[in-house]
Amino acid sequence: MPGNIVLIGFMGSGKTTVGRLLARDLGWSFLDTDTMVEERLGLPVKEIFAREGEEFFREVEKEAVARVATARQAVIATGGGAVLCGVNVKLLREGNKVVWLQVRPETALKRAGLDDSRPLLQGREPRDIAALLRRREPYYAFADIYIDTDGKEAAAVAREIKEALKAWLESLT
């Protein structure tokens, strides 16, 4: 039984930032599947999408998810689209607590839209982001816990996750 905390959610929801803080607070390791893909291929996500396309990226991402699924006491930040693959969902759920970091489209665009490393946000209007987020929401709904990140500092979100998972965390010790 792995016993990890898996953070899922749309781009700009705070998975990486919150994940690092939460891992530090818990004394756990932090794993980021996007970073793992970048390290494996030696390219940033944006270039992987541009050169090879999203389908290729998702295949390599699936390998990264399979690797993190065997971790123990780690906080895992997934790419925003990792949950589009049923195999990933199965691996991420098994023995772990999955937390959906929810974000409004406007907030996602403000947090991540200016970052040119986000290929699916490039050149998008707020209504496009809202439509993409709506299409993805059903894929995030399997999470054990939903946390709204709008208007909150990352440290407050990390504390909220710890509090929501308090009994589960105590059961691991």
UniProtKB/Swiss-Prot annotation:
Query: Which locations, inside or outside the cell, does it occupy?
Result: Cytoplasm
One example of a Gene Ontology biological process annotation: aromatic amino acid family biosynthetic process
Does the keyword field hold Lipoprotein?
no
Q: What is its EC number?
A: 2.7.1.71
Establish whether keyword Transferase is in the entry. Answer: yes
The UniProt entry lists the main location of this chain as cytoplasm
Which co-factors does it depend on?
Mg(2+)
Gene3D superfamilies, A to Z: P-loop containing nucleotide triphosphate hydrolases
Q: Which reaction does it catalyse?
A: shikimate + ATP = 3-phosphoshikimate + ADP + H(+)
- Residues that hold ATP according to the record: 12-17, 118
UniProtKB keywords: Amino-acid biosynthesis, Aromatic amino acid biosynthesis, ATP-binding, Cytoplasm, Kinase, Magnesium, Metal-binding, Nucleotide-binding, Transferase
Any one cellular-component term (Gene Ontology): cytosol
- What pathway annotation does it carry? Metabolic intermediate biosynthesis; chorismate biosynthesis; chorismate from D-erythrose 4-phosphate and phosphoenolpyruvate: step 5/7
Give the first-level EC class, as a single word. transferase
Give the residues the record marks as binding substrate: 34, 58, 80, 136
Question: Annotated Gene Ontology MF terms?
Answer: ATP binding; magnesium ion binding; shikimate kinase activity
Describe cofactor binding as the record notes it: Binds 1 Mg(2+) ion per subunit.
- Check the record and name the InterPro entries matching this protein: P-loop_NTPase, Shikimate/glucono_kinase, Shikimate_kinase/TSH1, Shikimate_kinase_CS
Describe the family membership recorded for this protein in Swiss-Prot or TrEMBL.
Answer: Belongs to the shikimate kinase family.
- Assembly and interaction partners: Monomer.
Its annotated function is as follows: Catalyzes the specific phosphorylation of the 3-hydroxyl group of shikimic acid using ATP as a cosubstrate.
What's the protein here called?
Shikimate kinase
Organism field: Moorella thermoacetica (strain ATCC 39073 / JCM 9320)
Point out the gene that encodes the protein.
Answer: aroK
